[in-house]
Amino acid sequence: MNILVDNYDSFSYNLYQLIGSVNPDIQVVRNDEISLGEIEKLAPEAIVLSPGPGRPEEAGICIPVIKEFAGKIPILGVCLGHQAICEAFGGTVSYAKELMHGKQKEIHQIGENQLFQGLPGTFPAARYHSLAALKEKLPEELKVTAESEDGEVM
């Protein structure tokens, strides 16, 4: 079973449908309606942290989830979830070089990564964010696997 932590974002259920098309055993939980102990009892195979409004430190249980389960359970962060992973490991999130609200831009893979399996090295993706993880402030535990055409961490 997979867990999708919903950070109160309408895109969460798009993720739910996509993940469910691969593995229908998925449970959605709100970022302020579940505890670490409850997540542990559910024994998820993977955790996905959704997009959402605000900054990572305002994303409910996301940073505690990352700190508790990183290295034990695969965790994927999308937008706000991605930023929460950055901050949980001691990285810095700041304003993006350019605000991206519903714009399509080219994303460039860096090396091979299972997450992007089957996609070309460069592919178009929708971007919708005002914040970004700062590459120069990433801890060495985190590896950049994709960048935008302007060099921001994806």
Regions from the language model: what does each represent?
Residues 79, 83-87:
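Glycine-rich nucleophile elbow surrounding the catalytic serine of serine-hydrolase chemistry
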Residues 2-4, 8-11, 17, 21-44, ...:
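Amide-donor transfer/coupling interface in amidating biosynthetic enzymes
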